[in-house]
UniProtKB/Swiss-Prot annotation:
This is Probable potassium transport system protein Kup. The chain crosses the membrane at residues 40-60, 83-103, 131-151, 171-191, 202-222, 245-265, 281-301, 332-352, 380-400, 409-429, 435-455, 462-482. The gene is kup. It comes from Caulobacter vibrioides (strain NA1000 / CB15N). Belongs to the HAK/KUP transporter (TC 2.A.72) family. GO terms for molecular function: potassium ion transmembrane transporter activity; symporter activity. HAMAP family: Kup. Residues 1-31 are annotated as: Disordered.
Length: 665
């Protein structure tokens, strides 16, 4: 059963806002925090833990997997220099130039992320277009595939470091690694319902220590073999790709692991602001990552030289952990475990936030979204999603069992999301920023070519694991597309079968029904059509309240709506008023609070003498709905399992009256 109430996730609740999304970040972040002095430093430090947690744990496995892929015909200095050079230039071209310089400018009132960019692109186009919609939904769907893989990949790679400790290398079997990783992940997912605000303050400092340790380890090994500094030249990356053919292309797929997590730079702009994130990357995170990759390369060179001197083959090592002195490996594993848990937390929080946005923008049905902090708006918990993520992460971990096996599944979803981001940024540049076509193409062509190259390289891993995020993304895309299409069909049918409010007023003037004391609020998605609940009340109860409010909730294309724009009241006649309540896609609807604003604007009523009328619709599949029968059934399943509108809109349950009707779709 599903409600006919104004559905924040129904397409007919079209995003509508007079606010023009800003083209550039200002001196505050999306939440109005001061970006000067101590405040700027605090935000930059906080971003180190949340924004860069994922990309900051890539050194655990990226260099190892890339060098293993390059060693198909054995390892020489050429392979080591080539892999390090490719890693460094991936960080420079993709993260620094593409994201920090260009993509982060495309913020939507301080917010970023694929759905925020979709809303901005739609605003720039001036209308909803199929292209932008498909791009946005595809990008969001692929993110969920990444969100399932990241925790398993990160935590496994950290726990596997125990095998590099001489005293533990024989006792730490694969089963032990899986057990420890499972306990860590179970603990992480179980604390989500209580929120992470209390421990979240430690994320930045812990990750700052992590990056500092990575820098120190890299510097220590670089000092022992400084020749690796030549890999900073792009010549070695180009030479490697030119000389290694298909192997070089395969290595590109592994090198891409160095930039997984890059989307977090835009997704978390609303929490930390553009400038603190950019400063943290340029002056701290990038130098630490670059130094660590150089250090791993230097350690690999030293190992190669030692092996060649002894007449032996180059061993396959866990380069990150084994470049540390043996006495420091256990503390390093513990620190890596903490860093990967923080990285996983950031991904989980990102999934919760994306889900909230998708619900508000009409891409998903209502879900139970709970706030876990009274003071921090970003602290939310989505129980159904948390359970699905946990089951998905554990299933993936026990299926692939090692980080090396999982590496084949990692990357394909991220490259897909990056292509979506590039295309929508191009639309914003052309339509909103008014860049000339040649100037916009200077951005689009090289970066889209780079994205497609990495996508093609990762596609070679499709059958060895790359199918997994694609399958998850395809499933989520189907769910979102079905929900949007089904909701639109339902809205169109309801509109065809409904009576315009103006016509109802004429009927009521001609035949006045019995009047009931108090106020009735009828929730609907279309303020111009008579709500189904109102028609049923007149038809079956044959009464009309003294005061009647037709209330609609709409979602804007901006993350937040000012209090001045929150409520719009239109008087129909002495008995009826229309109220439209506007929310941003980052906000949670709260009808009682909105009604308090209405009272300030002169709408008088007693909440204890007010009844909320909701229409409950029983959906029956039809062969002529415009969707295949399987899609009809999926839509009905989604509607039946949507969160109760009473809870979703925070309506006092004791004041709700529900009236049902059967509808075919």
């Amino acid at each position: 059963m599903a409600s006919e109430a104004p559905h924040a996730s129904a397409p007919d609740c079209a995003p509508a806002s007079s606010d023009i999304p800003q083209q550039d970040g200002g001196s505050t972040n999306g939440h109005g925090h001061d970006l000067k002095g101590h405040g700027f430093f605090a935000l930059a430090l906080g971003s180190v833990g949340v924004v860069f947690g994922d990309i900051g744990t890539s050194p655990l496995y990226a260099f190892k997997e890339a060098l293993a892929a390059a060693s198909h015909d054995g390892v020489t200095r050429s392979e080591i220099f080539g892999v390090v050079s490719l890693a460094l230039w991936a960080l420079i071209l993709i993260v620094t130039i593409k994201y920090v310089v260009f993509i982060m400018r495309a913020d939507n009132k301080g917010e970023g992320g694929v759905l925020s960019l979709m809303a901005l692109a739609q605003h720039a186009m001036g209308k909803r277009t199929t292209l932008v919609f498909v791009l946005g939904v595809a990008g969001a769907a692929l993110f969920y595939g990444d969100a399932v893989i990241t925790p398993a990949m990160s935590v496994l790679s950290a726990v596997e470091g125990l095998r590099t400790i001489p005293a533990l290398e024989h006792g730490v079997t694969n089963e032990v690694v899986l057990l420890i990783a499972t306990v860590m992940l179970l603990g992480l997912f179980f604390i989500q319902s209580r929120g992470t605000a209390s421990v979240g303050k430690l994320f930045g400092p812990v990750c700052a220590v992590w990056f500092g340790v990575m820098f120190s380890l890299g510097l220590m090994n670089l000092a022992a073999n400084p020749g690796i500094l030549m890999a900073i030249s792009p010549y070695y990356a180009v030479e490697f790709l030119a000389e290694h053919g298909l192997t070089g292309f395969i290595v590109l797929g592994a090198v891409f692991l160095t930039v997984t997590g890059v989307e977090a730079l835009t997704a978390d702009m609303g929490h930390f602001g553009r400038w603190p994130i950019q400063a943290a990357w340029l002056f701290f995170v990038l130098p630490c990552l670059a130094m660590n990759y150089l250090g791993q390369g230097a350690f690999a060179l030293t190992t190669l030289e030692t092996a060649q001197a002894a007449g032996k083959a180059m061993p396959e090592l866990n380069w990150f952990f084994e470049m540390a002195p043996e006495a420091l490996r256990l503390p390093l594993v513990l620190l890596a475990g903490a860093a990967t848990v923080i990285a996983s937390q950031a991904v989980i929080t990102g999934a919760f936030s994306l889900t909230q946005q998708a619900i508000q923008l009409g891409l998903l049905p209502r879900l139970d979204v709970r706030r876990t902090s009274e003071t921090q708006s970003g602290q939310i918990f989505v129980p159904q999603l948390n359970t699905m993520l946990l089951l998905g992460v554990l299933a993936i971990m026990f299926t692939f069992q090692t980080s090396s096996a999982l590496a084949h599944a990692y990357g394909l979803a991220v490259t897909g999301t990056m292509i979506v981001t590039t295309c929508m940024a191009f639309i914003v540049m052309r339509k909103l920023w008014k860049w000339s076509m040649p100037m916009a193409l200077l951005f689009l062509v090289p970066f889209l070519a780079l994205d497609i190259t990495f996508l093609s390289a990762n596609a070679l891993r499709f059958f060895s694991g790359g199918w997994l995020p694609v399958l998850i993304g395809a499933a989520l895309f189907t769910i979102m597309a079905t929900w949007v299409r089904g909701s639109q069909i339902l809205t169109d049918k309801t509109r065809r079968d409904s009576l315009p409010v103006a016509d109802l007023m004429d009927i009521l003037r001609a035949r006045a029904p019995h009047r009931a004391p108090g106020t009735a609020i009828f929730l609907t998605s279309d303020p111009d059509m008579t709500p189904v609940a109102l028609m049923h009340n007149l038809k079956h109860n044959k009464v009309l309240h003294e005061r009647n409010v037709i209330l609609t909730v709409r979602t804007a294309e901006t993350p937040r709506v000012s209090e001045e724009e929150r409520v719009k009241i239109e008087k129909v006649n002495d008995d009826f008023k229309k109220v439209v309540v506007n929310y941003g896609f980052m906000e949670s609807p709260n009808i009682p609070k909105a009604l308090a604003v209405c009272r300030k604007q002169g709408l008088k009523f007693d909440i204890m003498a007010t009844s909320f009328f909701l229409g409950r619709r029983s959906i029956v599949p039809s062969a002529n709905s415009g969707m295949p029968l399987w899609q009809d059934r999926l839509f009905i399943y989604l509607m039946r399992n949507a969160a109760n509108p009473t809870d979703f809109f925070k309506i006092p349950p004791g004041r709700v009256v529900e009236l049902g009707a059967q509808v075919t779709v």
